[in-house]
Amino acid sequence: GLDYPKTYIFSKGDKTTDFKFDYPVIIKPSDSVLYWQFPFEGMNKAYVAKDKDEFIEITNKIYSGKYNKSLIIQDFIPGDDSYMRVLTCYSDRNAKVKMMCLGHVLLEEHTPTAIGNHAAIITEFNEELMNKIKTFLEDINYVGFSNFDIKYDSRDNKYKLFEINLRQGRSNYYVTSSGNNIAKYVVKDRILEKNLDLKVQKEPFYWHVVPNAVVFKYVKDKELVNKVKKLISQGKEATSFGYNRDLEGNFK
C-alpha cells in the first residue's frame, strides 16, 4: 500500500482538538476551488498549528467566512523543503502508466497564498517508490495526468503521500524540460491513438523559477547545491522564465 501522514477530516462545528497524532499539525481546505472564492484577511494556502489554541484560532478564522466544507488535518512531517518530492505521471486510455517523472524539491515558495509551490527541482529516480505508485494507478484504472505531493519522513524512513492532484502540477515544466513533453503524450494517446512505451525519467535535470543565487543561498544541503552547480555546468538546466524565442525580432 501507499504510506501517508496520519489524517483527520474536520468539519465546521467540530469541537475536536485532540487527534491520534501530536501537534504541530497541518491544516488545509478539502475544497480549494471553493476556498479561494472567498478571500479573507490572513488567508493562507495551508497552515501549521503549533498547539490547540492556535488550531482553534486558525479554524475559527477559516469558518468565519463563507467557506463551509471540511478541512484536512494532518500530522506535520519534520524537514525543510528538500524533504519534499513531486511525481508526475501520465496514464493512457487503457489505464496503463506511460510516463513517470519524479522530482526532488530543493526550494518551495513561502508567500502565504503560494506556500508549497515548487520553486526548484532536480529530477531523480526511485524505483521502489515509483513502482508502488504505478501499481496503485493501474489497480484503480486511472486515466490521464496525476501529480503526487510526497514528503520523506525521517522518523520512519518512509515517503508519505499528501495527495494526488488529478492534473499536471504548477511546476510541470520540470517534466517537459527534462525530456518528457506532456503535450505530446496527450496528442499521441488521445488524438493519434498510438500505443506508447513506458518512459521513466532516470537522468537528473535541474529546473527552477527562482534565480540560481537564491537556490545556492537557501538550500541547506550543500551536496544538493553542488549537484545543481554540476548540472548547470553540463547544460542540464531550464527555467520557466527563460525562453529565448520570446524576444526574437524585438531587438535590432
Where does each model-flagged region fall?
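A short beta-strand motif that forms the metal-chelation/ATP-contact edge
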Residues: 157-167
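Glycine-biased flexible loop/turn sites that connect beta-strands or occur in inter-domain linkers
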Residues: 95, 156-157
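ATP-dependent carboxylate/phosphate-activation module, predominantly the ATP-grasp catalytic core
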Residues: 43-46, 50-53, 75-141, 165-190
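A short glycine-rich, hydrophobically flanked beta-strand micro-motif that places a catalytic Asp/Glu
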Residues: 74-75, 143-155
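Active-site nucleotide/adenylate-binding loops and adjacent lid/helix of ATP-dependent enzymes
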Residues: 1-72, 93-94, 127-131
